[in-house]
Structures are given as C-alpha cells and as structure tokens.
Amino acid sequence: MKLNNTAFLTTIFPMEEQFLIDFLDSLSKQTYKNFDVIVVNDSYKDFDKIKEQYCELNVVELPCLKTPAKNREFGINFCKDEKYEFLIFGDSDDYFSDNRIELSLSALNNNDIVVNDVSLFDDSGIYETMYMSNRLQDDTKISFEYIQNKNIFGLSNTAIKLDILEEVVFDEDLVAVDWYLYKGLLKNRSNAIFINKAITYYRQYKDNTVGLQVTDGKYYLWWEQKNGEMNEVN
C-alpha cells in the first residue's frame, strides 16, 4: 500500500541473503524516512522472513515478469500508476550512503534527473572510492551529448521526477535498460545533474560483472564507447 510520495524501486532475485540484508539495512538507516520500497520479486524465496525484520520500512512486493528488462518496465510503470512524485533506483545487491535519498530529493528540486557517485567494492572491501569523481565534479550538468558513447546512469545510482516519464516499454531482451532509458530522457530535454556527496556502494562479484572491465583482477565500470549491440535511441 502506498504511504509516501517517494518510491525506492528494486528487483530481487536469487542471491546471498547477506546482500539483501546489507541493502535493506542501508535503507533503514536513511536520514530521510518518508519513502516506500517497491520490490519486484524475481524468484527470491522466503522474502517474507526478511521483510518482517524491517517493519520500519513500507515494503510493497510485486510479482515478476519474464525478463530483467520487463521487470524494470513493470516496476517503473507501477510507480507511475500509483502516482508517486519521485522515483529512486537501487539494486538489491548494493547498499547506499545514509544521505542518498535526502540528497537525491534535494537535487530533484531543480533538476529532472539526479545521478550520484559510486564506490566499488568486493569481498575484500572497497577498492575504488567515488569512482565517477575521477572525471566529474559535484553539481555537473549532464547533457545528451555526454552519454552518446558512454554511460554513467545506472539503475542503482539515479533518481527522477516521475512527471518527466511516460509509460515505458522495453524490449524483453534489452540489456542496457539504464542507458536506453536515460538517453531517451535527455534527448527529450530532461535535465540531469551529477552529485558526489551521495554514494552507491556497487558490489562486484561473479554474477554482477556485465559491462565491466577487469584490471589487476578488479572490476571497473565501463567508460569507453558503447558497442553496436546496444539498443539505440534515434
């Protein structure tokens, strides 16, 4: 049941229980409390047992569709249909700085889209801090031209005003849902800003390495030119 005007959207899937606990712990510690957690459950068993540990969170659980892209589509459109004002994305195998929702909403006062910095970590701990700040300064405006051949917008480090978004339809086999979504929004003249005082802690492990490059045994986000297999927004 909807209780707030801000939705935090994620998809859960079979993974280590600790990943999901880390995710929900970070949401329960947010400095801003007035948000609903929308969860598309793609075959994670016994989620109820974990949910009941977080009674302070308003968790709305949804069924899954047949592909990851369609799960994203379903979750986004649900939030539109429920008339949420703001939508914050986060992957359920990541976790977030305590101020992420607060600072994202603050930045959305004057922007349509907010993208925050990421720190990369694995089982050994954090190995790259504020990764995007290597190339971007805080409060940098991000243009359509900037993401023509690269992507900084993930579905774990972005937030949007939902009134800029129509009902979405993704091809069921679409891989780069994030790039496709945000490239289309920027082409339609939505404005976006990068902030680095809110952090997504982006977990790197063997099942979460699509689109990453390996350097000295560590995975890094892919800043280089997108290949022709990506779905273009013409």
Identify the meaning behind each predicted range.
Residues 4-10, 24-27, 36-40:
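Hydrophobic targeting segments
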Residues 10-11, 138-215:
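Conserved nucleotide-sugar donor-binding catalytic segment
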Residues 15-29:
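Short, well-formed alpha-helical segments that are part of the catalytic scaffolds
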Residues 28-61:
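Acidic donor-binding segment of Leloir-type glycosyltransferases
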Residues 63-79:
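Glycine-rich, basic loop-to-helix element that forms the pyrophosphate-binding segment
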Residues 84-95:
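Short beta-strand-to-loop acidic/aromatic patch adjacent to the donor-nucleotide binding site
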Residues 99-129:
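Conserved donor NDP-sugar-binding/catalytic core segment of glycosyltransferases
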Residues 202-205, 211-234:
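Catalytic core of nucleotide-sugar-dependent glycosyltransferases
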